[in-house]
Amino acid sequence: VRVAGLQDQVRVGFQKPENKAGLTPKQQLEKIAQKTHALVKRQSSVYQELVYEQLKQQDVQVLMMDELSKTQKIFTQHFFEEHVFPVLTPVAVDAYRPFPTLLSKTMNIIVILEQQSEDEINEKVAIVQVPSVLTRMIKVPSKKGDTFVYLEDLIIDQINTLFYGYKVKTATAFRMTRNADLTIHEEGARDLLVEIERELKKRKWGAASRLEVRANE
């Protein structure tokens, strides 16, 4: 909420330094970004060096799609065809269809497509929402312990099946966090409860305050 409020101030051109820190909203955002990037880097290191290794010791592993055995690949393909493909709805983005409004903190995949015409290659963009009706961790058969793959990795692995006639140039998973700030005018609200309910519904569609992009392995 704090970051979203600062972003709102920058958006409207507010440049007055904040009394305690002596920094403008833009300068505060820059400081926050530096700190956040360092924290995310540390989080990744802790996962790789501690959590991931401890999971391996308990015979639990999360694999990339290219690390699966032939038998596991066959399983994931069948799982995709039976359970995932039926609930996927790709959305094209172009001059006539603007970028869709995505729910806060939902996992999505942005796909860059190429279509060959007689004289040129046309590039298009599509969005595929990772279905929330399915668990993100997909368990696959394993001779020892428990093995999982991420649902978004499985979708990306099979992404070509969604775009017949196109060549998939890139497919990248991302997640966006929206402004969850509540703006309630108590004095002008006839029914405070109704006003709160209205603002809570709007939180899902607030301005974007954070974008997380999955690194392509």
Range-by-range predicted roles:
Residues 1-217:
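N-terminal non-catalytic structural scaffold regions of very large proteins
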